[in-house]
Amino acid sequence: MSLENMVLAFMQEKAMTAPGDKVLCALSGGGDSMALTHLLHRLAPRLGIQVEAAHFIHGLRPEDAPKERQLAETFCRERKIPLRVEEGDTLEYCRREGCGTEEGARALRYAFLRRVAKETGCRKIATGHHQMDNVETILFHLCRGTGARGLGGIPVSEGDLIRPLLTASREAIEKYLEENHIPYCSDPSNEEEAYARNRLRHRVLPLLRAINSQAEEHISQAGERARKDEEFLESCAAQFLKEHSLAPGAIDAGALAKAPDAVAFRVLPMLYRQAGGEGTLSERHRQGMWALCKKGPSAACSLPGGIEARRVYGQLVCRKREENPLHRTFSPCLLKEGEPVEEGGFQVTLYRGKKEAGPEEKAYFFQNLREPVQLRPRR
């Protein structure tokens, strides 16, 4: 089957688009994105879609950027594909946000794509991820430690994002580029082994192909099966949470402790997100929450984003962690006998002689205290 027919069948099977949709292609000028844009432009009449393109200049390779921009503009002009071009400062963004270059470049690129899609009325954004990208992602997740979600690799679709080339091999894409005389630019950073992904691509994958020439296809298929299993288990976890939830972010700890691990460990991140947490939880954090289901009423553990998980009698509760008053800062001040001072979230009063503490008070007896008495934050 030709790449064109394979992509058409794949898009139809996964219902990536609907007739009348406008699709924005992420066009970098590299081979994958050029093949993607060419394919979608050719398939547009059969899919009933309109195709537009967007080209983002990251500012990381100023010597290559003009050539890539010219290629994208010429390619789109010849085919009457509307194109939006924008330039960003990735290094400045990374400095400001405190993130790595790859992470910063990706954040800027996707923010640009989504902004353009909104402005142009494009319901879908197509990216050029292919089978090798998916295999690299699965292997990368395995090396770092992952569950079934990570084994699923790159999703076929993700909200407004679609990946029509995800089952296409790199060889099939290169053949398509050659047969259709499609020009493209090569990114020299793809050859630099300073990046972990490139080491996987240039060192690990050739060894796997030597074991089985279809290794990439088999790994990708295994990822698809893992993704389907994950979707089913996620639905089981969501139903369990619905049945045993006591409040947003709270669940019956005893019921959760008796649940199958495969369900319980998917409920835990759901509780975390209900409490305002973002992203995923590491295995360490899940194990910490799981241990709370087995412990007494006073146990707690800290989670990312200022969230706390706590065992409250028969409940496992996730909530925003309260600020510790001892960590607050304030200006030092002098205490005078009988005059209350409110600082750092406390009311402090200096007395002579004995003083019994009320239900919301603490009394401390300091022998040989010398005046003046100063109240200050902890050092």
Indicate where each model-derived feature is located.
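ATP-dependent adenylation/nucleotidyltransferase module used to activate substrates
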Residues: 1-141, 171, 309, 325, ...
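Short, composition-biased local secondary-structure segments
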Residues: 29-47, 140-152, 360-375
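Flexible helical/loop "lid" subdomain adjacent to adenine-nucleotide binding pockets
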Residues: 124, 130-294
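AMP-forming adenylation/ATP pyrophosphatase catalytic core
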Residues: 3-32, 52, 56, 90, ...
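A generic structural signal for alpha->beta connector loops
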Residues: 48-50, 80-82, 148, 158, ...
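Generic detection of intrinsically disordered/low-complexity segments and helix-coil linkers/edges
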Residues: 104, 123, 178, 189, ...
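Secondary-structure boundary/capping residues
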Residues: 16-20, 49, 81, 114, ...
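A generic secondary-structure micro-motif detector
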Residues: 61-62, 102-103, 163, 194, ...
